[in-house]
């Protein structure tokens, strides 16, 4: 059950967004911006939700250091990123050291320019206090408190502002020793002026030690913990840390990642990057790529000399930039991206009547003998008339191996987990691969599926009634190698009781 705190609902004065001819754009003068759609963000049960209590995932890009390539941070470039790339969040990286804010406090004016642009464009913005070579955030704690007091005073009523108060603590700095005490003080400073905008806090070892933060979380309810990775350097061990942190109820935000190795060069490591992006998207974890710049490094999104104001063609994008743009566009549902929901035809279409419904499936968990069945599906309306979602029934067939009962969970749903209802049933004729099914239905609040539209991902997790391990290899609906969305006829869909997709066992 989703229990929402009372929230201060605040509005931005948003400019009218104009369309650009010849482009496939995410917004027009008739459609809502990300902030209009989601409003005030908060944390509930370790997940990022909008003001309606629906889970939301932010995807975007970060500037590089303002002292070096700050000219790329302006309203025109951010508008292009919103309209052509589909970003819903932008991160403005203000270094503290390395000729950053400490030596040049006027860089705060570029931060304010970026926030004003984000307010006008209706996108979320992360104000990043970019500690790095200074190792310990306490080195400039006094300056951080002054800076964030000003930012919170200016933007405490703007629901699109997010504060990142310690980019990458490193060296001998630990969560309990230095970072958490620092974060407590800076959070208090922010909360004295802004009661509820999100705060992101880094962890030790360049924001990799989120397991330490998860074990001793901050008391502020709207705090997320940053994890940073570079695909050529960091792999499964960090993904395992994310799973651990989430199991402890910690909210995770990947506020910086790159397609390169940790130096910013090498690669790009695109297969490794795709593994990471699939992992984050599967768990609904927000992410921001490094970086919007034309610097001579692999992780830069632009080639040397690219325009400072957007309008970039493919020739203006680096290999990394092309990949990241595709990933963001896919998440925003724009054409031309490498969309994870692009179907492949089933090898055995089956005998069910497809009608105007297509169901796509992917296996979320590659271990068929752990303690859970984890599956995800997406429904498409390929017809010409709207389909009322509450009329649909999705059935996932399995064999319970003699274990009674079931514990069912909705881990993710684009339509909102509160709009998904789960139960179990028994097929008319049991087989050695199917003596039960999980029934997934939609509440009336899910609305209708318009022609050409999709429900987006629904993730369901099924445990045996006694929480023992399961054996999925003999389950009718299980696809062991289906790790990306595929049209799947072994899960059925009924519309008002009539089979419209799939083949029953």
UniProtKB/Swiss-Prot annotation:
Annotated compartments: Secreted
Protein name: Endoglucanase 6
Enzyme class, UniProt record, top EC level: hydrolase
Keyword Secreted set for record: yes
Primary localization: secreted
Binding-site positions, substrate: 68-69, 95, 130, 230, 262-263, 290, 295-297
Region described as Disordered: 333-354
Region called Linker, residue ranges: 335-352
Annotated signal peptide: 1-31
Organism listed in the record: Pectobacterium parmentieri
Superkingdom of origin: Bacteria
GO CC annotations on file: extracellular region
EC numbers: 3.2.1.4
Keywords: Carbohydrate metabolism, Cellulose degradation, Glycosidase, Hydrolase, Polysaccharide degradation, Secreted, Signal
Family matches, as InterPro entries: CBM2/CBM3_carb-bd_dom_sf (IPR008965), CBM3 (IPR001956), CBM3_sf (IPR036966), Glyco_hydro_5 (IPR001547), Glyco_hydro_5_CS (IPR018087), Glycoside_hydrolase_SF (IPR017853)
Catalytic residues (positions): 168, 256
Gene Ontology MF terms in the entry: cellulase activity; cellulose binding
Annotated Low complexity bias: 339-354
Pfam name, any one: Cellulase
Family statement drawn from the similarity comment of this UniProt entry: Belongs to the glycosyl hydrolase 5 (cellulase A) family.
CBM3 domain sequence ranges: 353-505
Region (Catalytic): 32-334
Gene Ontology biological process terms from the UniProt entry: cellulose catabolic process
Gene: celV1
